[in-house]
């Protein structure tokens, strides 16, 4: 990653997992006091994020190791809640777009993938579209949450995309590093990333999204093996976020290929066809509460927490 001293990066974070069924809107104040980092910028954002297990922290590490000059015009993250207000969305996106407009060699974005604003169903796709209009040739690397709702606008706007491999999520910084490695190889001319993507009409409960269990274990295993062995540059599977009532809710996959997409398309179809074959496994059948309580009483060696999954306790 060394030797890119002349490069300037724009690094930013804009993350929200929007529950469209929630009656509570999400204003900019929610990002300021929300989960993770607040709506910060500049040195304050770098100070808060650097060295943390966040996608923004991972991207800052990538920029530092590359020896690049970089700015952080926006670092915003809020807990899952209702629609992001128009004012909040415009404030965050304007800060990022205005910084890109000043000129840069690459953009590194820590996004969620399931942001819904009052005026846009696809918050991330709209941001990427705005950036592309002013920087059509600048490579854009995006790190995404596993519960992304993938769209054409997102894929068309980005150069590289990677998603979390874990749920509960513990690999946020590493997801950014994976995208960052491909970005650096792109800037040095070693690779020429091209993406293919697709989805299947599966609206699955996030309670069956854990990659250590089937059916997600098989799908994630296929993607991870292809990336880790160099068959493709990056491969990600996204479970979608079922608490969002939007047209593009689905299980999806994005494959980042080098120069040609033939191998990636084969892998993509294999992953998605397998998901469809295993679709019954994405149904969640909860135990009756009485059974759960009785089972919990049997655990005497440690405390037991019975949580309402509607509060996103697994994230």
What are these regions (language model features)?
Residues 60-97:
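Low-complexity, highly charged intrinsically disordered N-terminal segments
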Residues 4, 10, 14-17, 21, ...:
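Active-site histidine-anchored catalytic micro-motif
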Residues 39-41, 72-81, 110-112, 271-278:
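Gly-rich Lys/Arg/Thr-decorated short loops/hinges at beta-loop-alpha junctions or inter-strand turns
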Residues 2-6, 64-68, 72, 98-107, ...:
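Glycine-rich phosphate/diphosphate-binding loops that line cofactor/substrate pockets in enzymes
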Residues 2-65:
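N-terminal amphipathic/basic leader segments beginning at the initiator methionine
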Residues 64-68, 101-102, 133-136, 163-166, ...:
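Generic secondary-structure signature for well-ordered alpha-helical cores
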Residues 207-315:
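Hard-cation-handling environments
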Residues 176, 180-224:
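Conserved anion/nucleotide-ligand pocket segment
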């Amino acid at each position: 990653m060394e030797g890119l001293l002349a490069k300037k990066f724009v690094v930013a974070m804009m993350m929200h997992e929007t529950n469209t069924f929630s009656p509570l809107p999400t204003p900019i104040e929610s990002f300021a006091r929300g989960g993770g980092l607040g709506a910060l910028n500049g040195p304050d954002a770098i100070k808060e994020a650097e060295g943390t297990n966040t996608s923004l922290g991972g991207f800052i590490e990538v920029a530092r190791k590359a020896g690049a000059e970089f700015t952080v015009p926006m670092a915003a993250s809020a807990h899952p809640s209702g629609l992001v207000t128009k004012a909040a969305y415009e404030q965050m996106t304007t800060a990022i777009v205005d910084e890109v407009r000043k000129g840069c060699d690459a953009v590194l974005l820590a996004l969620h993938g399931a942001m819904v604003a009052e005026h846009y169903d696809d918050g991330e796709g709209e941001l990427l579209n705005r950036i592309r209009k002013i920087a059509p040739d600048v490579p854009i690397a995006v790190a995404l949450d596993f519960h992304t709702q993938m769209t054409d606008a997102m894929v068309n706007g980005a150069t590289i995309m990677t998603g979390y491999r874990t749920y509960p999520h513990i690999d946020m910084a590493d997801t950014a590093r994976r995208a960052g490695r491909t970005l650096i190889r792109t800037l040095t001319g070693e690779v020429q990333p091209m993406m293919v993507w697709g989805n299947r009409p599966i609206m699955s409960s996030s309670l069956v999204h854990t990659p250590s269990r089937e059916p997600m274990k098989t799908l994630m295993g296929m993607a991870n093996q292809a990336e880790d062995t160099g068959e493709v540059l990056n491969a990600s599977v996204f479970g979608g976020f079922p608490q969002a009532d939007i047209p593009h809710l689905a299980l999806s996959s994005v494959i980042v290929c080098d120069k040609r997409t033939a191998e990636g398309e084969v892998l993509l179809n294999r992953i998605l066809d397998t998901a469809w074959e295993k679709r019954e496994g994405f149904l969640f059948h909860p135990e009756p509460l009485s059974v759960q309580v009785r089972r919990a009483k049997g655990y005497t060696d440690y405390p037991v927490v019975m949580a309402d999954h509607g509060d996103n306790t697994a994230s």
